[in-house]
C-alpha cells in the first residue's frame, strides 16, 4: 500500500510542478489554489508512505516520479525539447526508480 500511496504522491508532485508555471508567481487564484492543494496532499502522502518505506528510497522515488513526469509533460504538452540525451537521462532516472523499488524490502 505504501508504494501505491508514494506513486500517487509522485504524480501529484507533477501536478504542482507544472502548476507552478501557471500560477505566475502565485498571482493567479485558480492555478495557485490547485498547485498549493497538490503540494499539501503530495507531501502528506509522501510522509504517510515514509512510515513503512526507508526515507532515502521514498524521497528518491517521489522526486524521480516528479522529475520524469514534469519533463514528459513538458515535452508532450509544452513543446519542450525531446533530445536523445534528455530522453536517455529520463530513462536512467526511471531505471533508478525501478531499482530502488526492487531493492527495498
UniProtKB/Swiss-Prot annotation:
It is a multi-pass membrane protein. It is found in: Cell inner membrane. SUPFAM superfamilies: Multidrug resistance efflux transporter EmrE. One of its GO terms (biological process) is monoatomic ion transport. Keywords: Cell inner membrane, Cell membrane, Ion transport, Membrane, Plasmid, Transmembrane, Transmembrane helix, Transport. One of its GO terms (cellular component) is plasma membrane. The keyword Metal-binding does not apply. The chain crosses the membrane at residues 2-19, 29-48, 55-77, 87-104. Residues 20-28, 78-86 are periplasmic. It holds the Pfam family Multi_Drug_Res. GO terms for molecular function: transmembrane transporter activity. Residues 1, 49-54, 105 are cytoplasmic. Belongs to the drug/metabolite transporter (DMT) superfamily. Small multidrug resistance (SMR) (TC 2.A.7.1) family. Gdx/SugE subfamily. Guanidinium ion exporter. Couples guanidinium export to the proton motive force, exchanging one guanidinium ion for two protons. This is Guanidinium exporter. It comes from Klebsiella oxytoca. The gene is gdx.
